Design a protein with these regions (language model features):
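Helix-turn-helix
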Residues: 145
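Conserved acetyl-CoA pyrophosphate-binding loop and the N-cap/start of the following alpha-helix
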Residues: 110, 114-122
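Conserved catalytic-core motifs of GNAT/GCN5-like acyltransferases
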Residues: 136-140, 150, 155-172
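Acetyl-CoA-dependent GNAT
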Residues: 7-12, 16-103, 107, 120, ...
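A short, internal acetyl-CoA/4′-phosphopantetheine-binding micro-motif in the GNAT/acyltransferase core
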Residues: 104-111, 140
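Conserved GNAT acetyl-CoA-binding A-motif
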Residues: 120, 127-140
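Terminal substrate-recognition subdomain of acyl/acetyltransferases
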Residues: 2-4, 10-11, 155, 167-185
Length: 185
């Protein structure tokens, strides 16, 4: 299946997708036990309504996109949101060229289609165009994502032991940090 181009979330225009953002976030936590801000169980008023905590999180991210503190990239498959990633900007005079890669999440239904790679390529393209040349990110040690980032040219910086609480079994897990200098590509 041919994928449409990655698009940038536009506040107002794409607000109708907030529930889909939240449901993908929940799916990734429940399916892969992704260390991504929240723990299950997720509570739904009805099947079409995501957990209020997760929905509010994405509404806050949409507000940050409106304030140009974040750029959110989306991959659609037809009319459905399949995955997303955010580029966070640094609000400091000593590092205006730094950015953070946040919440690269692809719905389990749309995996193995190259969506993560496409999202990251678009994020890097836009980052460069904005003068954001040094990207950093983190992910759980041993997660599938840990293997993706080196293939995309990210350098493993190191790990912090017992960094986060696993949504699977509440044990403490390590977090791995990566960076990529876009000036060198």
């Amino acid at each position: 299946m041919a994928l449409s181009p990655v698009i940038i979330f536009e506040p107002g225009k794409h607000d109708y997708l907030m529930a889909e953002f939240a449901f993908i976030h929940e799916d990734c936590v429940e399916t892969d036990y992704t260390l991504a801000t929240f723990h299950p169980p997720f509570h739904h008023k009805d099947p079409s309504t995501p957990d209020e905590r997760v929905l509010k999180y994405w509404q806050n991210n949409a507000a940050k996109a409106a304030d140009e503190q974040k750029v959110i990239f989306m991959q659609m498959v037809g009319e459905k949101l399949a995955g997303y990633v955010a580029l966070g900007s640094q609000a400091c005079e000593t590092g205006p060229f730094r950015g953070s890669v946040e919440k690269l999440l692809v719905s389990p239904r749309y995996r193995r289609m190259g969506i993560a790679k496409r999202l990251m390529a678009k994020l890097e393209e836009v980052a460069l165009s904005r003068g954001t040349t040094l990207l950093s990110l983190d992910t759980e040690a041993g997660s599938p994502a840990e293997g993706i980032y080196p293939r995309l040219g990210y350098t493993r910086l190191g790990a912090i032991p017992r960094y986060g609480v696993s949504p699977k079994d509440r044990r403490l897990v390590d977090e791995v940090f990566f960076y990529k200098d876009l000036r060198s590509i």
